[in-house]
């Protein structure tokens, strides 16, 4: 959020919270909540989500870390679900694209995960769960093997290694969706809601 005025332009943050059960055949009315704050600090979503229990699908912003139940020393009722769109984007950053041949491996495998999701979007929970177990789980295992094997051959400072470590450090949160029919592969619903609000 930009707030032009006198002198330097002030910036703020628009936090977006979305509920949309349509992809898993839920019947709750979709809803979007926008909260504006003058700064982007983790304490803001902590305040917004005080008392919330459940799954939070978000990007890798470090300010969210204190929200999650598995954070060191924290005992909250919020479980992290990471976003595959953010992870996939790492392989399309220009410094990583210079290693284009190696980037095809994860990009193709992540694309296959999205194909599984395309087939189950809007389907009943049991069908989504079965399809993910049959089709997504083996692809996740294959991708994890590729990431581990490739990382072991790279310089730790390479941009591709950084992209891989981003995903591996979030692996439990990235793969959580595959075991829960009510979760999505990414948080693109929030991205779409943000785009509608800012255009």
Q: What kind of feature is each model-predicted range?
A:
Residues 1-199:
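Catalytic center-proximal scaffold of phosphoryl-transfer enzymes
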């Amino acid at each position: 959020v930009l707030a032009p005025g006198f002198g330097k332009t002030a910036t703020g943050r628009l936090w977006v919270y979305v509920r949309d059960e349509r992809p898993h055949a839920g019947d709750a009315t979709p809803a979007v909540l926008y909260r504006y704050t003058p700064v982007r600090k983790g304490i803001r979503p902590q305040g917004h989500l005080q008392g919330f229990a459940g799954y939070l699908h978000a990007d890798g912003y470090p300010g969210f870390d204190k929200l999650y139940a598995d954070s060191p020393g924290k005992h909250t009722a919020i479980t992290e679900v990471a976003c595959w769109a953010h992870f996939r984007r790492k392989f399309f950053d220009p410094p990583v694209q210079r290693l284009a041949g190696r980037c095809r491996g994860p990009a193709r495998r992540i694309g296959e995960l999205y194909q599984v999701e395309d087939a189950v979007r809007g389907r009943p929970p049991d069908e989504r769960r079965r399809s993910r177990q049959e089709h997504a789980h083996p692809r996740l295992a294959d991708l994890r093997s590729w990431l581990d094997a490739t990382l072991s051959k790279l310089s730790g400072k390479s941009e591709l290694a950084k992209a891989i470590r981003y995903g591996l450090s979030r692996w439990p949160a990235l793969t959580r969706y595959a075991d829960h029919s009510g979760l999505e592969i990414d948080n693109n619903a929030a991205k779409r809601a943000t785009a509608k609000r800012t255009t």
